[in-house]
Swiss-Prot record:
UniProt similarity note: Belongs to the bacterial ribosomal protein bL25 family. CTC subfamily.
One annotated GO biological process: translation
Annotated InterPro entries: Rbsml_bL25/Gln-tRNA_synth_N, Ribosomal_bL25/Gln-tRNA_synth, Ribosomal_bL25_b-dom, Ribosomal_bL25_C, Ribosomal_bL25_long, Ribosomal_L25_dom, Ribosomal_uL5_bac-type
Name used for this protein in its record: Large ribosomal subunit protein bL25
Species of provenance: Nautilia profundicola (strain ATCC BAA-1463 / DSM 18972 / AmH)
GO molecular function term, any single one: structural constituent of ribosome
Subunit structure: Part of the 50S ribosomal subunit; part of the 5S rRNA/L5/L18/L25 subcomplex. Contacts the 5S rRNA. Binds to the 5S rRNA independently of L5 and L18.
Keywords associated with the record: Ribonucleoprotein, Ribosomal protein, RNA-binding, rRNA-binding
Amino acid sequence: MLEGIIRESTSKAETKKLRRDGYLIANIYGKGQENINAAFKTGDFIKYLRNKEHLVFPVKVGDKEVKVVVQEYQKHPVTGELLHVDLLMAQDGVKSYYHVPIKVKGTPIGLKNKGVLIYHRRRIKVKAAPENLPDFFELDVTNLDVGDNILIRDIEMPEGVECFLNPSIPVVGVIKAK
């Protein structure tokens, strides 16, 4: 489980000091819940996120243990270093918007016909309660030829999960290489 500290002060000087000491600044918030200003060791946070298996993961801040989802993050424009992360509390029974990642399986037929697999979207925004939330959407791309796409409407949504995006938006496709 990922462990962090509660930030007592939210001043600019205190934030800079924490970043210098190797901490990642985080805000944890949720519907009807009090915001928690936290900080995590940057290396531990990145390592944990790369190896996590589920979209929703537990964190311990001070003596509080909450289930969260990464909602938004900020990177340094030059170095690409992670500066700040917003974590949304995943409360059972409360529907919220989440960005669910896309994973593809198989090799498209179109790659043999001088095509290239293109991701139009890496994540799909859905509204669901955390208990119904899929960890990812797996798309089978083996039958895609040059010019074919998988659209939002082609994705099977689990029960209790709603997608409000335009159904004709492409997610992945194969285009002709130039």
